[in-house]
Each structure stands twice: as structure tokens, then as C-alpha cells.
Amino acid sequence: MIAQLFKELDPTMTISLRTRLLTVLMFTTLLSGCGVNNIPQYDEQVKSAWAQVENQYQRRADLIPNLVETVKGYAKQEQDTLTRVIEARAKATSIQVDANTLDDPAKLQQFDQAQQQLSGALSRLMVTVERYPDLKSNQNFLALQSQLEGTENRIAVARRDFIASVEKYNTEIRTFPGKLWQMTMYRDQKVRENFKATAPNAEQAPSVKFQ
């Protein structure tokens, strides 16, 4: 193969120049085979996975105002529960973490805690709804509940994908030869923070269905 490349080079080149060019080509091929491109590739996977996490949490937040208004029409006396959902949503949407700040453990923890608090508030709201048969049979509420259930499932999938992509990326820059490439070519690439499993089944979607 090398001999064939050597023959196909411009014949006007000197042997020395052709040799240097082939050396560069061989070195580039060698680097590629040694995973020199893994870090940027895995970094893009982390960013893509995080974008899905953000999208699904935003979709959930967008469903909540209509859900609250629908419940309020049937259960005005549950104002305290509804207020807790509204406040939890406001807090969750106020904390923003973009793909470029995923190396900030405090920021990601704040984001995750706020989202988990919102999950808890929604679960308590669904328990409250059990006391209102007319609300449980309302078509608008049933549609919102179905959308919310689907979104919670997609959130769980997005979180699992993000966790897996971060673990893959972090392993790459902590082990050889990835650590060597990080130290020499990708010094701006840092270890990414990940979600912490704070409870059993933490990555499972919370139930928003009636028992």
C-alpha cells in the first residue's frame, strides 16, 4: 500500500519531499487508529445527550400550566398542592445548565434537585386527583396525563443515555491513551459531571397513572 502511494505521488516531487509527505500520512493514520479523535467524538455525544435531557424536561414544564388549570377547575380546595407544583416548576425552569458548563458539579446538582422536586410535586398532585372521579374522567385531563406519562418515560431514557455518554467520555480522558491525547491535544476538555443516583430506581420514570 505504501509503495503504491509512493508511485501515485507527483513525479516532480523530490524523493525527500515524497518521503516526508508519506510519513505525515502514515502518522495521521496511526493517530486515527490510536483513538486520537475519540475525545471530541465522545464530547459531542455528551452534548447531544444533554440536549435531549433539556428538551424532555422543557416539554414536561410546558405541560404543567394546562394540567394545573384543568385540576383547578375540579379541585379548587387543593390550592396548596397546586401551588407547590407551580413553585417547583418555576424553580426547575430557573436553573439552566448548558453543555459547556457540565463540568460544574454544583450547578448540575442544583438542576437535578430542582427537577426531582418537581417530579415529587407532580406525583403528590396525582395522588390528590384520586379523590376526584369527575376529574379523573375528564378527557382534557386524561390527554394531559397521557402526555405527561410519555414525557416522564422519555426523561428517564434521556437521563440514562446522558449518564452512559458521560461515563464513556470520562473513562476516555482518564485512561490511556485517551489521557495522553487530553494532556497534549485537548487540554480544554475536562471531566464532565454526571447525575448522581440518590435513591433506588432513581432513573425510573415516576408514576403519573392512577392506581
Task: Indicate where each model-derived feature is located.
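A helix-centric hydrophobic-segment signal that preferentially recognizes long
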Residues: I2, F6-Q211
